[in-house]
Amino acid sequence: METPILYYWAPCSTCSVTVNFANDHGIELDKRDVEQEGPYTELLALGGDANLIPYLAVGGELIQGNDAVIEYLTKTYL
């Protein structure tokens, strides 16, 4: 199974909810901070909006927001 990519901003308290959930449940994520140009450009190319982070990219799909990301992680990994 491919490692999901989490587009987030490290200081963002909203993003920390998803990061902490994954950490607490031992779910490996490829975390990419959109404050850096590379991840920011990747997210835009996928159709995401850095103002609406976090996003989870998995299987060609882009999942937006804590609730949707946590729901996906729960169904897939727990």
Spans of features found by a protein language model:
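Rhodanese-like catalytic fold shared by cysteine-dependent sulfurtransferases
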Residues: 46, 75-78
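A basic- and aromatic-enriched beta-loop-alpha substructure that forms the phosphate/nucleotide-
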Residues: 69
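Local sequence-structure signature of Cys/Sec-based thiol-disulfide redox active-site neighborhoods
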Residues: 1-29
